[in-house]
Amino acid sequence: MGSRPFTKNPAPMMLTIRVALVLSCICPANSIDGRPFAAAGIVVTGDKAVNIYTSSQTGSIIVKLLPNLPKDKEACAKAPLDAYNRTLTTLLTPLGDSIRRIQESVTTSGGGRQGRLIGAIIGGVALGVATAAQITAAAALIQAKQNAANILRLKESIAATNEAVHEVTDGLSQLAVAVGKMQQFVNDQFNKTAQELDCIKIAQQVGVELNLYLTELTTVFGPQITSPALNKLTIQALYNLAGGNMDYLLTKLGIGNNQLSSLIGSGLITGNPILYDSQTQLLGIQVTLPSVGNLNNMRATYLETLSVSTTRGFASALVPKVVTQVGSVIEELDTSYCIETDLDLYCTRIVTFPMSPGIYSCLSGNTSACMYSKTEGALTTPYMTIKGSVIANCKMTTCRCVNPPGIISQNYGEAVSLIDKQSCNVLSLGGITLRLSGEFDVTYQKNISIQDSQVIITGNLDISTELGNVNNSISNALNKLEESNRKLDKVNVKLTSTSALITYIVLTIISLVFGILSLILACYLMYKQKAQQKTLLWLGNNTLDQMRATTKM
């Protein structure tokens, strides 16, 4: 991952650094515990320390390409030295010419604005076809012009020294170290040995070593044929030029051994050629080093997801790739401003994003809050190794245990299978055989199931299918609406006016009142009729009794 350009406004960056430092001082850093959600297909792959850097330090290396031999041995090595000198001049003259063209293109006439404008135009012509990065390198080369001139002023004394490492400070605005890889070889082979060597052996040894160094020079400057002065030299190239003497400059600039290996892997230590003098065979390189600030209490945690098995098919968890935790706060970390090494992140700024409550709860160990996206691709990751063990989706791939032999089955509803040496010593996954040495302890949650409500649609094809279903539902609703409109069109609008409705309501109420009164009257008449019938019946019975009594008498 490449680094982003440095910000033009330092204020936001300083504010970010201060906020990060304050946060790092308040709470101790906690690494996210991946054991609760490993069985849910979310795996913590590692942590890295987070650092802030700016490319603010510079120093110069003056590479002495032509060694000084002892006086009594100069004649023996004259032939290989002359051939080496000619080859050096042929190889590096385009580099020196390119440097001079760019540096001389900024000469001004009279020091006014017009002169600077003309110089800028000539500089653009001198660059030819250049990328933005090469234009930036050209600007740095122009800024180093005075320092290169000061080095050239001391070139005779630098070329005359027999020291392999020599610090140059006279009249220079920055630290400069003269190093000679070939001079180191001469000193080790001839100046510090009491063994007498014949002339032929001296010539052979010098010739072989010079040829090897020429090969290294060709390797270093081979990619710079098109724009020899504008391409950066990597730290590996600088070590090829200076040998072990490169460490002297780095130590002087404050790079400790504990940072050196990480910074070398980051690619932040680079160099740009600023001069080449064919007369003395001196090559000047300006080295740029980062100024690093360590955020001791901030770490970046990397997450990877597996394809898990659900009742709706295979799915992968929706979580950030990188998160950072300070205290109890977990946020997504944007690494686009960072350069990664094996153990560190070097960032020009710290940019984090808050996460939704669901993802926060998921990464805190609540797997029921994790959301998943359907994944049906053939390249979806079905398994992953972690600390000598394996987390695998044995429904997506065949988990064959070689020792002891058997097929590892995954229970219905189980998201993934956690396989360690307790269950299988040698495991075969899709033709890949792994010997397991780790073990999942009791802190790892197992037999986690993913509910249907946790699986959402995010793939383009799935979304298209769902949209098609929605469109069909909308079409059906529109058809029903049109049918309803047709029925409403048949209704007489005049009968549905407000006055008509009021009349209908009043008439309905009157009808109800009359109906109720009629019902009451009918009930009264029926009651009265029954009463009359009872009276007549009583009178009839009474008369009959009197007649019976008279007859008996």
Curated annotation (Swiss-Prot):
Residues 522-553 are cytoplasmic. The inactive precursor F0 is glycosylated and proteolytically cleaved into F1 and F2 to be functionally active. The cleavage is mediated by cellular proteases during the transport and maturation of the polypeptide. Residues 463-499 form a coiled coil. Residues 1-31 form the signal peptide. GO terms for cellular component: host cell plasma membrane; membrane; viral envelope; virion membrane. InterPro entries: Fusion_F0_Paramyxovir (IPR000776). It holds the Pfam family Fusion_gly. It is a single-pass type I membrane protein; Single-pass membrane protein. It is found in: Virion membrane; Host cell membrane. The chain crosses the membrane at residues 501-521. Glycans are attached at residues 85, 191, 366, 447, 471. Keywords: Coiled coil, Disulfide bond, Fusion of virus membrane with host cell membrane, Fusion of virus membrane with host membrane, Glycoprotein, Host cell membrane, Host membrane, Lipoprotein, Membrane, Palmitate, Signal, Transmembrane, Transmembrane helix, Viral envelope protein, Viral penetration into host cytoplasm, Virion, Virus entry into host cell. Disulfide bonds join 76-199, 338-347, 362-370, 394-399, 401-424. One of its GO terms (biological process) is fusion of virus membrane with host plasma membrane. Residues 31-500 are extracellular. A lipid is attached at residue 523 (S-palmitoyl cysteine). Class I viral fusion protein. Under the current model, the protein has at least 3 conformational states: pre-fusion native state, pre-hairpin intermediate state, and post-fusion hairpin state. During viral and plasma cell membrane fusion, the heptad repeat (HR) regions assume a trimer-of-hairpins structure, positioning the fusion peptide in close proximity to the C-terminal region of the ectodomain. The formation of this structure appears to drive apposition and subsequent fusion of viral and plasma cell membranes. Homotrimer of disulfide-linked F1-F2. Belongs to the paramyxoviruses fusion glycoprotein family. This is Fusion glycoprotein F0.
